[in-house]
Amino acid sequence: PTSGLFAGEGHIPLACTPDSASAAPISGGVDECETEFSFEMTVTRIYESPRVTKPYSEEQWEKIESLGHAIDVDLEKGDVRLTMGGEPTFVSTDDPDGAEWNFTAVSHKKRILSGELIKRLRGKFAPGSLLHYGQGKWYPGEPLPRYALAAYWRKDGVPIWKDDSLIADESKNYGHGAKDAKELLSRLASLVGGDPKHLIPAYEDAFYYTWKERRFPTNVTPEKSNLKDKQERERIARIFQQGLNAVVGYSLPLKRAGGGWISGSWFLRDDDTLWLIPGDSPMGLRLPLDSVPWVAEKDFPWLRQQDPSNPKLPELPKEFPYRQRFVGRAGSPTLPGEGRGQRAQKLGEKPKPLEPLPPDENPLHRPAPGQSAPWIIRTALCVEPRNGRLHLFMPPVETTEDYLDLIAGIETVVTEMGTPVIIEGETPPRDPRLNKLAVTPDPGVIEVNMHPSKTWDELVERTEIIYEEARQTRLGTEKFMLDGRHTGTGGGNHIIIGAETPQDSPILRRPDLLRSLLTYWQNHPSLSWLFSGLFIGPTSQAPRIDEARNDSLYELEVAFKELDRNINTFGYTPPWLCDRLFRNLLIDASGNTHRSEFSIDKLYAPESASGRLGLVEMRAFEMPPHARMSLAQHLVLRGLVAKFWNEPYKNDLVRWGTDIHDRWMLPHFCETDFRDVIGDLKKAGYPFEFDWFAPHFEFRFPRIGDLEQRDLQIELRTALEPWHVLGEEPGGGGTVRYVDSSVERLQIKARGLAGDRFAITCNGHRVPLHPTGTNGEGVAGVRYRAWQPPICLQPTIKSHAPLRFDLYDTWNKRSIGGCTYHVAHPGGRGYDTFPVNSYEAEARRLARFFRHGHTPGQIKIPPLEKNSDFPFTLDLRKV
């Protein structure tokens, strides 16, 4: 600093000399002395606005950590048994303009990054876990289901998959083909008790593709068909290049029987040749199961997976020995006998044959014409070579023990062969004895499904690791819009509360806890808006209960009364009643039970085991850019759960009416309301501080600019605006519904107002300032059309930009000063790309606000127009 090099960065040079020695505070010679010389220099910022890059000082974070431990103590005392999970989302830091990071859900690049991330997280959280490459959700309009990469591991610490070198790399070609697939499946069949003779080779449907080829124009070839559908074009080219007579993979009909596994035949029409259903999915999803011998509905051998809410699940076995299935004379299979498969044979041990199966249970018995065949095995394990790698498609099973037994057999075989494989297909059954961590794609983001945490320390450790490992994978937690606005990833950071087992769920044990949370969130709109994303409103991903239907609050009060009646009458509430009472209320306008601020579709839905998990998902949380900001959100919820566990919240529901989209859209009122939340937590004994959430407010309601004129101060901040889904329109080969994001809102706050002399106008219209409780201070919202798309509400209304604000002196009929806010670049420049970093984004924001631009001369403004529906907002579309 003595050279003055940092003066341009805002530092104040204390001494500037050509020679640094001449600026030294001490010079000259010294004699020996015992005096010790020391110096200290500190730099303190006079003022620092809250920022997301470093949201908390170390002193603040120590207080947050201490409070987290204190809440843990209360949760332990109350025997709450609370666990918390989450679903953080991430975007690419290298390709912000890519379609997969803005619109689409799946891409090759996203798949590679997802694979790298799941392996990193597996190494941190779950060494020895099973890495499963499965199929995820399938949404209308998407050609294939989305991928779902997951790691499963046992809570008792016993590894499921021991050798990581046997997990194939998706980016590597090992040169494996159909011959390797057949050998692997043959060895596996012999090991677990099946018969290699029951392997069925699978082929692409030659008749279908021959018919398809006959429909091509005469001037194209299958390799270059010029079809409009890119995926169809690539599929046909790939199949004809590999040949219609090439084996796609092998299938082994397999099911659990007794203490082992048995295989059988499918008695297909074409000499046991398996013609796959045309498509791009793994062969396990394309098996022609309708070609397997017919079975009457009353005789169908349904698989009944274990219930995760069963409190009597035993401990999982530490090891999985295999029984060798002994086969007597041809056509007379037996039940699994004693022994340990291939290992037993190598030791010279012979399994003893048991009694032959009766014909109505024999999987090798061919059914007569018209005869129902319930004995036919209808599940299969498939091995498919794909891009030089072997993919094993797991069959559905009933219990976790069966699944782990089969996985242990697979690892034994691939260890002997030295062949790395990829496990796909069916996932392990839902089981509280297993933990799961998953990475899945969503439109514009990659989502991580965290495993639940029991304590604050676990939650802190796991959240920080996930953020850091994502950063190492070149995935970030923030985006910048074209105009430079700083936003989250665009995805959620949903919080899931429950327990290790469904029967321990605090929501099922104390349904009044759900009532308390619902009522408190409805009473305090700041909890809905402060942590949410840009897309809010009645048709958003997480609408409030009072946004969707007008009668929701009345019906919710009836449900609360019924809940109280059951508790008072019987002393408890059965778990299914909680689902029945609230399932049809916690929905969006279309009736979707998942798209709700409080989603209970995994609480205790009776129709499936996966719906009876005792979980409540809170979906109105956007991804914050810093891990500690996310943890602060979790801490608020943990504090409220601890508070309501001891003191249920039974206040009346508030009929906000249009206020919910008027007053509560403004940051001033959200801040006031959230201060009340902090006050309630303090009264409960939890010393939260409002300053801990200043970064959240600054991130959610960024400051646009300010103006100071004659002791009057004006501040502009971004406010909230609900986006509405419009009506159906034809487009894209089907029916589409657009989202209208063309309307925006900002807040204007004025300080130093004296009486009625001064008014504030926007584009010549008086702004309806409302008192805030502080003398001389007023606040209002301005709603305006930012841009004019062809499809929106009121499409004939043009953009109101730029917004010119005047500080109007009613005595002199003049503007004494003003400022101007541009929605886009003031010079008319249209940005083609997103900002590359925060500096460019800041430059774009600063370029759109000017502290000048008032209206000159004497002006006459119209009287204030009162809007009874939205009294706090000046809607420029209506004036």
Residue ranges and their predicted role:
Residues 6, 37-39:
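Aromatic (phenylalanine/tyrosine) cluster motif
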Residues 43-421, 427-444, 450-489, 500-879:
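C-terminal accessory/tail domains of diverse enzymes
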Residues 12, 26, 30, 41-43:
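Short hydrophobic transmembrane-like helices used for membrane targeting/insertion
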